[in-house]
Amino acid sequence: MGFFDLFKKKQDTAAPQEAAQTEARSSEAPARRQEELNAGLEKTKSGLFSKLARAVAGRSTVDASVLDDLEEVLITSDVGVETTVKIIERIEARAARDKYMNTAELHSILRDEIARLLEEAHGSAENFGLDVREGEPYVVMVVGVNGAGKTTTIGKLAAKLTRAGRKVWIGAADTFRAAAIDQLGVWAERAGATMIRQEMGSDPASVAFDTLKSAKANGADVVLIDTAGRLHNKIGLMNELTKIRNVMAKVIPGAPHEVMLVLDGSTGQNAFEQARQFTQATQVTSLTITKLDGTAKGGVVIGISDRFRIPVRYIGIGEGIDQLRMFDRREFVDALFGETGK
C-alpha cells in the first residue's frame, strides 16, 4: 500500500449512501480542483507573465537579449538562480537546434521546460508511492521552522486522514513552545485524532517514543510527529532530530517512513535557505509548501524541488482543510500557464 492509499475511505466504514455521495463528489472533483488551484496560483501566474510580456514586448525572435531578460524574470519570480540557469541553457540549446525561435513560442517552450524539470524531480509517475507495510502505523516526522505552517499542516493532514476512516495519532514533540502543543491539541480534537503530549520542556524523543508505543498498541494507521523548528542552533537541531529518529526506529523498525519538510512559499528565497539547512540536518524525503495563495513567489515550488531533488507532496493554497492539496505537477503547470482540461 502506498501513502496515497491511506486517503481512500475504508470500505467497511462507508455506508452505501455515503459511498454514493463520495462518488458524486469525485466526479466533480477534477474541474473544481483545477479552478481552485488556478485561483490559488493567480498571483504567481500574473506576476510571472506580466514580467514575461514586458521582456518580449516589441521583439520577434528569441535572441541573447531576450534570454537575458527571461533570466531576470525567472530569478525575480523566485525560481532560483541554479534552476533559472538550467532553464535558460535548455532554451538556448533548443534555439540553436531549431535555428530560429520566435517570441510567440516562448510561452509554450517555457511551459515545456518547467514541466520537464518537475518530472525529473518527481519521476514520471503522477504520485510517488511509498512502501507502507501492513499491520504497522505509517510514521511521518514533520520538520520546519516556526511560522512555516507546520502545525496547521499536521492538523489538516490529520483531518483528511480521519475523514478517510484512518486512525491517526499525533505526537506533540515540539515541547519548546506551549502554543504549538495547545494548537495541535485543538486540531487533534477537531480531526478526531489522538494526541500524545508531555509537559513543556520534556524530551522530544520521549514524546515520540510514547506516541509510537501508543499508536502501535492501539492499531493506528498513521502517526504524525511534530518537531521543533529552531534553526539558530543547527548542531542542536541535527542532534535532536537524529535522536528522535533513532528512538522511533526502536519502536517501529524503519520509522520514520517519511520526513516531511514544511516551507512557507511566501518567503521566497528564505525557503531555499531553510531547505538547505534542514536537508543538512536530517534526511528529508518530501516537501509541503504552504501559503502559495497570498504570494507571487510560487516559483519556489519549481526551484526547490529541482535544486534539492525532493518531491513536493502537498501545497497550501488557502485556509481550508481541502486547500492543503496533494501536489500534482501537471495540474500545477496547467494552472501556472493558464491551461485546463489536459
Where do the model's predicted regions map?
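Non-catalytic terminal/linker segments enriched in charged/polar, low-complexity residues
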Residues: 1-128, 133-141, 163, 168, ...
